[in-house]
UniProtKB/Swiss-Prot annotation:
This is ATP-dependent RNA helicase mak-5. One of its GO terms (cellular component) is nucleolus. Residues 510-666 form the Helicase C-terminal domain. Residues 1-10 have a biased composition (Basic residues).
Amino acid sequence: MAVDKKRKNTKAPASGPKRRKTQPSSKQIKRPVSVDALAWKTVDIPEMFDDAEGFFGLEEITGVDIVKDGDVVKFMAAVPKSEAEVEDDGEEFGGFDDEETPKPAGNADQEVKTSETKAEAASTPAKEKKASKDQRKPKEQQKQQKQQKQQPKKEQPNKAANKKNAEDKKKARKNEKTTVEPKDPELETDLFTKLEELPEPEEEEIDMSEWVPLDLSPRMISSIAKLRFSKPTVIQSKAIPEIMAGHDVIGKASTGSGKTLAFGIPVIESWLSAAETRKQNKEERKGATALILSPTRELAQQIRDHLQALCKGLPTAPYICSVLGGMAVQKQKRQLQVADIVIATPGRMWEVMSSDNSVLASLRNISFLVLDEADRLLKDGHFKEAEEIFKALDRPPVEENNEDQKMGGTDEEGQEEEEEDSEEEEEEEEEHVNKRQTLIFSATFNKNLQQKLAGKSKFKATSTQDMEYLLQKLNFRETPKFVDANPVHQMAENLKEGLIMCGDMEKDLYLYATLMLQPTRRALVFTNSVNSVRRLTPLLENLNLPAFPLHSGMIQQARLRSIDRFKANEGAKKKNGSAAILVATDVAARGLDIPDVDLVIHYHVPRAAEDYVHRSGRTARASNSGTSILLCGPKEAVPTQRLVAKVHAQAEVKAGNSGNNTKKLVSSGLRTIDIDRRIVAKLRERVDLAKKIADAVQAKTMGGKEDDWMKKAAEDLGVDYDSEELEKAGKWGGKGSSKKQKQKEAQQMSKGELASLRAALRDLLSKRINTGVSERYLTGLDVSELLKGEQGLFLGQVDGLGLDD
């Protein structure tokens, strides 16, 4: 009996309808098709290619499989099925029958009957009803047989019924317990839903009267009021009227002065007016309104966030998208099809434009071309893609007739047509250029600031030469209006600058001392190389400081994650109350508006004076105050003197006119900071241990990568890899040999030695630094001040950097 039951259970699923019939059948099948019958499509050649080397008239096909059967090649293409083929594909699933039961084993007569009824149904559609009745008979017989088999076992249905009654009783008891009548009628309603009905707290009214002279729409002024900007900045009050009047503008203002809204407000105002006109005339959208280029990805993301925040208060807002590296190209192409304002970096923008003619066609009709941090974008030897973008936007669209003329025609006719085409292209180009406003903004347009501080050149460019340089790089439709918000000073007004003189090998020590003297101020540390960022970040982390890296070698998601953590001041509460620290290269030097950055430290002297201006501009933004400190070694003394002379050039002229010497200039621009040598000496042991640990970890990581690379190279060349022979051959006594030897020693450090170093550093960090206070006698101490600084690093009174006075 057990065997029969097993057979019955195994055959039960076979009698039911198959699951695959519930899935919709495909309406297309692939069949062999001749080459001429395929749906070929013409390949669009990018307009940027002046010479396609004869590859004209190319066609492509998709969705075709190539099958090779011996020497015969077949093209299998998708062909729609006919209605008859779709009907024959299988019977439609009509649901499960209530009385359907599995077939009993060995019932051959019933199987014959069902097969006969199926054959009759297939051959004679008129007998469908009869066939269905014949199909029901074996089902009834199956049911009777099943009941007969179950008659000896009468206890089974009784047990099932009793079990069901018990479950019903349990459910009823459970419902009685859960349904409790509320004693208070007010509790019957959900009070949390009423919170949505409560009126929002009224915000304080802001006086926006100073925005009225700029001739902005009421909805724009209302949107600005929601951002809590009561009055425009100097660059905004000067640049917005000129842009609204339709002029090309070159705007110069110090860092943190609101340059983004200076060009963002007119661009959005133009889109709003154009959208209303299209709505009234029932016209379709022709393309994007503005293209905004920025040198870095982080700045592009920030511009997008600022403009989106401005558009939140508008009833209808433009669609703003960012096109930058590190993100999916296909998604960006889809966004460009509907984008009204495009914010991009030159590299990714050129990649998309050069591969898709539709993107280039939509951007040719833009009303605004904006260059933020234009001096960086237009710098010689940088961002060649930006120049290609300008040329592509100025080039008139290529027509099909012109392409046909390129492929055929006599020489004389070709020359005449080329002359006519060149004249027409010049006229079209002039008309095309005149439609677009060009806006460029930056904090530094002086070419003198772009020169390397370590060089020997003494070239000094005048303001007229700077303007000529910009006019040569860009095709303005008119002489641009030059708006200078700070003609005298390059730096922000509320910025305090300091200079710390130290040894070349003591920069790590003085960096740590500076951060410890300002523990509650969020700091941004700038270096000149990616390797320095990779070395300093673990060094500061070993010293229990929340440090985050940012450099060009990181993927885009890691960059954004570091910036978000720094903005959120993540880890400050866990790491002895110290504020967050961002260690970055010049990637973070331009445009980034990170709130509450109080301290900027230049670990290396910048390569150019403009880099110092933009680095220091990350603090003291708007009306806030900030501090910029430069760590200078003996080898960097000459570049530092040149830096001071170039950055404070206007102050030098004023000092010369008043009879002062240049030495007073240094004291007025950069104040020398003297840190207590006793504090530095007591911090030295901590820094040395942290440096050894960081160098050992980095050497082990880099050593493993180098070995893997050498092994792979040896395998590719078919050479045996012997690390000892390579080490002997690679030994030399020249420049860099001592550094290589130190890396090797750090790489050979064992885990036990590394653990002992960590334990020693942990012990030092758990103690507070005594600054000359007697721990035995408290008579000479201010106990209240001591209790206030209980969680501080120093035991006793410590003077700060001395820049606040």
